[in-house]
């Protein structure tokens, strides 16, 4: 990982990302910041389950990753770090840590499956994913988006591969967190580390 990409990943703020212009499995990432906030609070199990479901089903669908996925992974890594730290005294945090580790293994498996196929090079910088030419329209129009999906090349090859590559890089940037998990999370963390 380049130092520039590592710094970008570790310093990125939720407000730096134009979520409403990033694709997900079921639309756009407009509501991602709200769901991250619910997960960060780790207060109410039902709310955490609902937000986690919304994020994970929109970030990965049938082994396909989306434009919002690598950015989502950055913030889920930070939330995992907090959940692991609080897991001993907060049952919601304990639940969330286990679920996130399983989801990370799923995302990394998607990266490896894609990486084994012939693919384009990733964009040189994580921040390149936010170049204007790759962002979708400012205003969300479901019909317009559906028409765009019918085009031959919805995403340029290097951009599409970058959804996978930078999702992997996001987790890699927080590898030290995975190496220091509480004992009860050692097995799922080891499964994630094996895929890094």
Language-model segments: residues:
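Residue-level signature of the C-terminal ends
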Residues: 58-62, 79, 83, 107-114, ...
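Elongated alpha-helical scaffolds
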Residues: 94-109
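Short sequence/structural elements of tandem HEAT/ARM alpha-solenoid repeats
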Residues: 67-76, 116-122
């Amino acid at each position: 990982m380049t130092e520039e990409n590592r710094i970008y990943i570790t310093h990125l703020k939720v407000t730096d990302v134009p979520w409403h212009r990033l694709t997900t499995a079921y639309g756009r990432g407009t509501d991602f910041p709200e769901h991250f906030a619910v997960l960060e609070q780790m207060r109410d199990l039902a709310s955490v389950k609902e937000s986690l479901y919304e994020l994970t089903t929109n970030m990965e669908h049938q082994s396909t990753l989306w434009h919002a996925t690598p950015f989502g992974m950055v913030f889920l890594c930070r939330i995992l770090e907090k959940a692991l730290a609080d897991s001993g005294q907060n049952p919601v945090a304990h639940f969330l840590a286990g679920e996130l580790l399983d989801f990370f293994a799923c995302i990394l498996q998607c990266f490896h499956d894609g990486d084994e196929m012939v693919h384009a090079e990733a964009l040189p910088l994580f921040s390149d994913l936010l170049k204007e030419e790759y962002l979708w329209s400012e205003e969300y129009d479901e019909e317009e988006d559906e028409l765009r999906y019918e085009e031959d090349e919805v995403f340029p090859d290097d951009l599409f591969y970058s959804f996978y590559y930078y999702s992997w890089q996001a987790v890699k940037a927080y590898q030290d967190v995975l190496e220091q998990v509480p004992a009860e999370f050692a097995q799922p963390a080891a499964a994630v580390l094996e895929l890094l």
